[in-house]
Amino acid sequence: AMPMLRL
């Protein structure tokens, strides 16, 4: 899975 952590 690909965590969507876009900061």
From Swiss-Prot:
It comes from the Eukaryota. This peptide exhibits both potentiating (contraction) and inhibitory (relaxation) effects on the anterior byssus retractor muscle. Keywords: Amidation, Hormone. The modification Leucine amide is found at residue 7. This is Catch-relaxing peptide. The lineage of its organism: Eukaryota, Metazoa, Spiralia, Lophotrochozoa, Mollusca. GO terms for molecular function: hormone activity. It comes from Mytilus edulis.
